Amino acid sequence: MGTDNHSVRVSVRGIYATALTKRLLDADYEIVQASPVIRERFDIDFDTVYNTVTVTTTDDHQGVGIHGTESAVRSVADVLTSCGRDTLAWDDLTPPGVIFTAQITETQGSGAICALIPAENPDTESKTEPDLNDVHIPDESVATGYLPYDSTDKHIEQGDIMTVQSHRSMPPWDNTDQRADAVVGTTLRANGGLATLIQGHEGVTVDTYDDEDARELAGMIELIDIDLPTGWGIEVNHAATQASLTALKSGLERAIDRAEDISDGAVAEEVTSTGRWLWFGRESRFALDEIRRSVITTIHGHHRIKAAGETASAGVDLAEALCGDIGDGNVQIQHNEFPFEVVTQQFGPTEGERVELYHGKPEGHAFSLGQGEVTDWDANGTIEVTRRISGHGSGTYDELGTPRESGDTAVTRVREGRWWYPTVYRSRDGEHKGTYVNICTPIECFPKSIRYVDLHVDVVKYPDGTVERVDDDELNTAVTAGHIPPALAEKAQSVASSLERALDK
């Protein structure tokens, strides 16, 4: 793996925590800062010391972000991507903690959009901004940042150049209104894995919901013999309330080293934060169910249902609690079928509701193909979505070459778990304009969106009945670039061949 597993300390959070903790423990990694729930499930005395890697579920529950030192991140990512062939991984362009030079390109109501380039030896002590008069940052930018006005004490105008730090990065498939890779700020932070130093901050802040624990921890920190860099204060997270005095001191010393490096404008490469984003496909979510099931009662489709949102997640917790823990003599879950009917009737989508077709790409980004109405629903997992083509109409339908006109309909039939779906295009008068069959990762029907990742190769059926397989070259290019694993590409090619034969009959 390129690194010693015993030197990698991983903290895991979110809906995938139990399965990923089990997977990493089996691969001989050290888990630290475990939550009370994880401690109870594994009955292990996990250490509360600083981490070198964090694994955190994304806000949309679709995957995880892995952040920390480069060698450790790569090592952990390799282990977790092996959970399923439809787990896809991409580099995080803006991992938290990385410092950039930014130029404001657009001001909005509550924040500004900025172009980001890597900062070279930022002068953070003097507060002077870099002299980049000869550089047009938007042309050289590696990413886009969103700077909330309440994350800076500066007056922001379009064209301003400043030093910023990534405070929270977003996965490439994220579809927020900010259109940014990260939320950034002008306040600099030095994360030590258990404690964080904040430039311009005073005293000690404890980020915990327990006031008594906060007071006790603040008192412990006052007992530690450390020299803080001038102008930096301390913030510690909730996990630190369970840490020993020795562990606290170690975490603070690590944060101090990073703060001094930031102040000197020379952050050491071995401690610079890097990141990988992992998106779990449906097949991978079910593989994670199996891993979790070896630890605790887990219904079929546990992670698939939880990925639908907080309400669905709470429903899963209730169902599993009622079924009881493994081996305790209570009622157990017997069936191994995903309860599509129950899940969609409870949370959606069902007939008459509107959903988006959310089209992921192997390069990491994703976009909506548009909203449509669910015009048919079946308990076997099939959903029909009808979209009306509006506007003046221009151009042609992708690959089909037939005119795209206002009044056309696009009828898409998807089935939960299937590796493909057809869309039939018809004119206002019902004339067939062609059928486009998209080959993709197993489809998931979430309450507000149908989701998958497109695998490039497709099969089309023209109005005259001719069948053609298209975009094999794009699939091959994606494999060469490392965007699609070979095993996933083989599956896509196999599905394409089967569909081509079936449609040509």
UniProtKB/Swiss-Prot annotation:
InterPro entries listed in its UniProt record: DUF402, FomD-like_sf, Ntdp-like, RNA-bd_FAU-1
Recorded name of the encoding gene: fau-1
Signal peptide from the UniProt entry: none
PANTHER family: PTHR39159, UPF0374 PROTEIN YGAC
Record-linked Gene3D superfamilies: FomD-like
Identification of the protein by name: Probable ribonuclease FAU-1
UniProt cross-references to SUPFAM superfamilies, sorted A to Z: FomD-like
Enzyme class, spelled out: hydrolase
Positions of region (Disordered): 389-408
Single annotated GO MF: RNA endonuclease activity, producing 5'-phosphomonoesters
Protein family according to the UniProt entry: Belongs to the FAU-1 family.
Role noted for this protein: Probable RNase involved in rRNA stability through maturation and/or degradation of precursor rRNAs. Binds to RNA in loop regions with AU-rich sequences.
GO BP term (any one): rRNA processing
Keywords carried by this UniProt record: Endonuclease, Hydrolase, Nuclease, RNA-binding, rRNA processing
EC number: 3.1.26.-
